[in-house]
């Protein structure tokens, strides 16, 4: 039975065509209509194992766990565990724009309001009781991204070894929370200045809240992305975003986590550039990355000097 037939049978309604959803989604992601309702369907690609980013059942579980919380997420409508597994969720209205990286016509004032609202949504996320999973601490995060960095050719990561030595002085962990893993405006849908849904839960985990926070702050300043970023006047500073997130309670050791996020971004970009140059994923835009990779490593090192 085709995926479309399985979805229609589970919903008990005839559906329209499964149309691929544009954007950088893992697995197979479609939109479809059933009557007046629109849905998003995520499925494991045929022949692939439901692990990592393709473990869509794990994504469905966390969306269901967050239903009714102060974190806006699409409602899960149906889940089918039969291989290849899939689930259907509500189509969340809104737009997801990364102000300093995406081409857009968003007013700077609205971009700033959205960043402050996202900081509050992140705080709400970290106040949700985490699922009963083994937490990944700061040391585990460092180990994971160190492996990725070491897979990048040395000439693409100048200064990385010095940075990794500095990062080896790992701070103690805060109590574990639910971590989104890629929390930024590009993964939060907005209607005006109101967050309508946090999406793309492929790499959620239980861990230190500062992992999410450091990553989110990275996208507040175009200067972090030489040759890629665009100035957006009036965006909140990192200090203003931290205040929106933490209120009166200071978050310790953020300097280390801001450096970790830069190392992580450099490792991801270096990995993508290597794949392009090896012919594994043709994308000429990857050739724009070296200045940002170098800047990420340099500024991370400066943070820990």
Annotate each language-model stretch with its function:
Residues 199-204:
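Activation of the activation-loop gatekeeper triad in protein kinase-fold domains
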Residues 213-249, 261-279:
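Active-site activation/catalytic loop segments of kinase-like enzymes and analogous catalytic loops
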């Amino acid at each position: 039975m085709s995926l479309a037939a399985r979805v229609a049978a589970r919903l008990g309604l005839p559906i329209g065509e499964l149309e691929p959803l544009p954007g950088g989604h893992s697995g197979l992601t479609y939109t479809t209509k059933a009557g007046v309702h629109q849905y998003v369907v995520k499925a494991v690609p045929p022949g692939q194992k439901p692990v990592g980013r393709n473990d869509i059942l794990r994504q469905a579980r966390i969306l269901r766990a967050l239903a009714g919380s102060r974190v806006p997420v699409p409602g899960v409508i149906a889940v089918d565990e039969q291989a290849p597994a899939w689930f259907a969720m509500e189509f969340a209205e809104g737009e997801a724009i990364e102000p300093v990286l995406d081409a857009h016509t968003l007013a700077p004032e609205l971009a700033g309001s959205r960043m402050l609202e996202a900081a509050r949504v992140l705080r709400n996320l970290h106040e949700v009781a985490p699922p009963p999973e083994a937490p990944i601490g700061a040391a585990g995060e460092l180990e994971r991204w160190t492996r990725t960095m070491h897979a990048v050719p040395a000439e693409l990561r100048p200064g990385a070894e010095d940075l990794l030595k500095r990062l080896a002085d790992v701070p103690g962990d805060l109590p574990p929370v639910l971590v989104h893993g890629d929390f930024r405006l590009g993964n939060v849908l907005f209607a005006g200045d109101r967050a309508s849904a946090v999406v793309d839960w492929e790499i959620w985990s239980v861990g230190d809240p500062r992992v999410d926070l450091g990553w989110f702050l990275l996208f507040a300043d175009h200067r972090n992305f030489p040759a890629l970023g665009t100035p957006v006047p009036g965006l909140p500073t990192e200090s203003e975003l931290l205040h929106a997130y933490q209120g009166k309670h200071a978050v310790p050791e953020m300097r280390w986590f801001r450096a970790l996020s830069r190392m992580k971004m450099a490792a991801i970009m270096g990995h993508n550039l290597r794949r392009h140059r090896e012919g594994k994923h043709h994308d000429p835009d990857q050739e724009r990355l070296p200045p940002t990779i170098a800047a990420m490593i340099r500024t991370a090192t400066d943070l820990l000097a």
